[in-house]
Amino acid sequence: MGDKGTRVFKKASPNGKLTVYLGKRDFVDHIDLVDPVDGVVLVDPEYLKERRVYVTLTCAFRYGREDLDVLGLTFRKDLFVANVQSFPPAPEDKKPLTRLQERLIKKLGEHAYPFTFEIPPNLPCSVTLQPGPEDTGKACGVDYEVKAFCAENLEEKIHKRNSVRLVIRKVQYAPERPGPQPTAETTRQFLMSDKPLHLEASLDKEIYYHGEPISVNVHVTNNTNKTVKKIKISVRQYADICLFNTAQYKCPVAMEEADDTVAPSSTFCKVYTLTPFLANNREKRGLALDGKLKHEDTNLASSTLLREGANREILGIIVSYKVKVKLVVSRGGDVAVELPFTLMHPKPKEEPLHREVPENQTPVDTNLIELDTNDDDIVFEDFARQRLKGMKDDKEEEENGTGSPQLNNR
């Protein structure tokens, strides 16, 4: 808890009768476990009457146009669905309250009901495929939705106006230990040349953070009688779509075409620097992002970290990155190598559980810190993410969505 209090995100149903409170919008996948989704739902007792309060968590893979669902075609696959009866609490759903839930119930009163979900670690991270200008419907990709509503049973049809829907994100952060420094080399023998051309390339490290420049060291030994006319460096994003059949889509996210030449019987060495940015790739249809294009906190999708023995069929979209170094050789074709690397966000620093106490000040009793200190120090914030300027302000962003590239047409 910092000096500014504990931030809690809230969202109300369109009819104003239900409000969901969550401590965060992004939940971290630590490879072996995932942060639990814990929160409370506040319900108007006059609206609830004799009904029950349900909360569901759904992980869905959307891969086509929703408006075609009326034709009997399904363009969505639910990878995971969990239901909790928040009130009255079902015995199998009853779990110990988290610290956040205790504080929220104390602040909001007796009509605030807790819910907790455990996300299995083998589920995919949140990824959106960037839409094209002609695309309509929800964005294609993997998303997680928390939905709260009142009903007599789970099968009852619920109008959107009477429910709260929140799209949360499952994210991964860069591992603390990077892999080995990426290096690659190849040798090409040409006709009419006694000696070969040798290309060697390396990156300065294996893990890069979003927005960080990538240094590519290129070394060419040209013992042939041919000339290297150009050197092309590109950073490519690969998205493996794992659903029924695995398909791979690749998209360049940073490129440099240098007019550097390497004459026959000579050597060449140079470091090239490229920085992949979403801002330079906003028009590319099918590019994998970690959020929606209209949100400020969206960037290129992070590399996917896989558990050993993970079932690829339910991993949705697996994202990876490679640097490609290509030599254009006169009358000899191209010579190329690829360097895989990891692109992610660094793991944020964890906030201390307790405030620092100056040496000349008597520390507060431990029990008071745990039970009473700052119980009212909660800052409520709307769940909706900050939009980029000029982006259309949807009234119900989870309902209307952005356009989606359709995988069946690609």
UniProtKB/Swiss-Prot annotation:
One GO MF term: G protein-coupled receptor binding
Domain of life per record: Eukaryota
Locations listed in the record: Cytoplasm; Nucleus; Cell membrane; Membrane, Clathrin-coated pit
Region feature Interaction with SRC, mapped onto this chain: 1-163
Statement: the UniProt record of this protein carries the keyword Nucleotidyltransferase: no
Pfam family for this entry, one: Arrestin_N
Region (Interaction with CHRM2): 45-86
A GO cellular-component term linked to this record: cytoplasmic vesicle
Ranges of compositional bias, category Polar residues: 401-410
Start and end residues of each stretch annotated as Interaction with TRAF6: 318-410
Motif position, [DE]-X(1,2)-F-X-X-[FL]-X-X-X-R motif: 385-395
PANTHER family named among the record's database cross-references: ARRESTIN, BETA-ARRESTIN-1
Name of protein: Beta-arrestin-1
